Amino acid sequence: MELQLTGKESGWWIVSHENKLWLPKGELPQGNAANWSLQGATARQIGEWQGQAVWLIRQMMSTDMGSVRQLLDVDRGLFQLAGRGVQLAEFYRSHRYCGYCGHQMHASRTEWACLCNHCRERYYPQIAPCVIVAIRRGDEILLAQHVRHRGGINTVLAGFVEVGETLEQAVSREVLEESNIHIKNLRYVTSQPWPFPHSLMMAFMAEYDSGELRHDPKELLNAGWYRYDQLPLLPPPGTVARRLIEDTVVLCREEQFDDGE
């Protein structure tokens, strides 16, 4: 339930608008609302972190509006809560009116949803399922530079799940479309909420099966096989892509050690 802040409330403050996040001094604000001049603002608690409430305020600040990416190097749990806040703020902003009848909607008091009193339609935040996979061939891992990535970062392959397909089918399809290779021994590893803008990354590892590597220029600038101890610039720590790469490196080292014995 939303409330108007008196200034005495305390916790972590997620102030967000249009997928931007208020980060004074590059950090997520913490402490009393009055210390950040937030009294009078409308807030809603969206979780807890380290025993303190996490509050969402849906508004634009005049300065220090940044990206939730800037919190990647903080604790994973806090990054996820910040991502939740940014996604919820954008959800409420984009669902002020019902898509069926055009009447104004209001936020539910019991769940993350927007309700229409006129036609009784109910809307929930959109979550886009994505698959991401690390592919190993002996002591090498397949890495690529995506056209949308900056700074020369090399990462593993990923893509959105299409309507009517399983996660496993999505992995195989994306790999074939982007690299022209087939994979085998696919296994699930972990997942990560990814608020750019509203994805849920489901991570896999797989082994090379067949096919000649040929990247899709519409998706990738280049792609190649890299030995596990000669890797290029990688995604930052805290990303599920980095986790997959590091797990693959561990496997390669273990196999090399076993072969050495």
From Swiss-Prot:
Q: Which reaction does it catalyse?
A: a 5'-end NAD(+)-phospho-ribonucleoside in mRNA + H2O = a 5'-end phospho-adenosine-phospho-ribonucleoside in mRNA + beta-nicotinamide D-ribonucleotide + 2 H(+); NAD(+) + H2O = beta-nicotinamide D-ribonucleotide + AMP + 2 H(+); NADH + H2O = reduced beta-nicotinamide D-ribonucleotide + AMP + 2 H(+)
Q: Is Metal-binding included in the keywords of this UniProt record?
A: yes
Keywords of the record, alphabetical order, are:
Hydrolase, Magnesium, Manganese, Metal-binding, NAD, Zinc
Protein's gene: nudC
Q: What organism is listed for this UniProt entry?
A: Yersinia enterocolitica serotype O:8 / biotype 1B (strain NCTC 13174 / 8081)
Task: Give the record's subunit note.
Answer: Homodimer.
What InterPro entries does the record point to?
NAD-cap_RNA_hydrolase_NudC (IPR050241), NudC-like_C (IPR049734), NUDIX_hydrolase-like_dom_sf (IPR015797), NUDIX_hydrolase_CS (IPR020084), NUDIX_hydrolase_dom (IPR000086), RNA_Hydrolase_NudC (IPR022925), Znr_NADH_PPase (IPR015376)
Q: Which segments constitute the Nudix hydrolase domain? A: 125-248
User: Any idea what job this protein has?
Assistant: mRNA decapping enzyme that specifically removes the nicotinamide adenine dinucleotide (NAD) cap from a subset of mRNAs by hydrolyzing the diphosphate linkage to produce nicotinamide mononucleotide (NMN) and 5' monophosphate mRNA. The NAD-cap is present at the 5'-end of some mRNAs and stabilizes RNA against 5'-processing. Has preference for mRNAs with a 5'-end purine. Catalyzes the hydrolysis of a broad range of dinucleotide pyrophosphates.
Q: What is this protein called?
A: NAD-capped RNA hydrolase NudC
Q: What is any one of the record's Gene Ontology cellular component terms?
A: cytosol
Q: What is the lineage of its organism?
A: Bacteria, Pseudomonadati, Pseudomonadota, Gammaproteobacteria, Enterobacterales
Residues involved in a divalent metal cation 2 binding: E174
Record text on cofactor binding: Divalent metal cations. Mg(2+) or Mn(2+). Binds 1 zinc ion per subunit.
